[in-house]
């Protein structure tokens, strides 16, 4: 892991929110290319029309001042939130950004009074799966209708 200057911040300015949105759109392109399928079933078109309304919080990671990674926390149902769209640009990899962003999201969720955090990921995304496992996420049953067969559903008790 590199010791290059890394900053993790809660995206609140218009500029930071726009940078998170751009990273999220890059994430969708990456995932759709990786899976060879559209994520439209997740309601992404509506999500980005009203962005960032659906999110409780957005986090942005910067490396040497440049936007490199992001994630968000969405309410799912009472007491449960969902970690969404954790993505690190290739230029930002190797700095532990995925771990740092997820840790920030967990701290937020605890402070906000959530008792569980859900997420879904692809089993083939080994680095992401390792982060989640190391942080204590465990496998759960499918919690939404997802037509993709390789999804993994996980939860963390907060």
Q: What role is predicted for each listed range?
A:
Residues 1-5:
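Basic/polar N-terminal segments that are highly enriched at the extreme N-terminus
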Residues 6, 10-84, 89-90, 102-104, ...:
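Acetyl-CoA-dependent GNAT
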């Amino acid at each position: 892991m590199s010791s290059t200057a890394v900053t993790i911040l809660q995206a609140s300015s218009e500029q930071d929110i726009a940078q998170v949105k751009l990273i999220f759109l890059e994430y969708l392109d990456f995932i759709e290319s990786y899976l060879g399928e559209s994520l439209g079933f997740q309601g992404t078109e509506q999500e980005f029309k009203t962005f960032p309304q659906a999110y409780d919080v957005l986090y942005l990671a910067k490396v040497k001042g440049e936007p490199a990674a992001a994630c968000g926390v969405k309410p799912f149902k009472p007491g449960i939130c969902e970690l969404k769209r954790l993505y690190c640009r290739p230029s930002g990899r190797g700095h532990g950004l995925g771990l740092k962003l997820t840790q920030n999201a967990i701290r937020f969720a605890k402070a906000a009074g959530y008792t569980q955090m859900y997420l879904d990921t692809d089993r083939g995304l080994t680095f992401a799966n390792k982060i989640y496992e190391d942080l204590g996420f465990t496998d759960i049953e499918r919690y939404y209708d997802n037509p993709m067969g390789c999804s993994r559903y996980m939860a963390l008790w907060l």
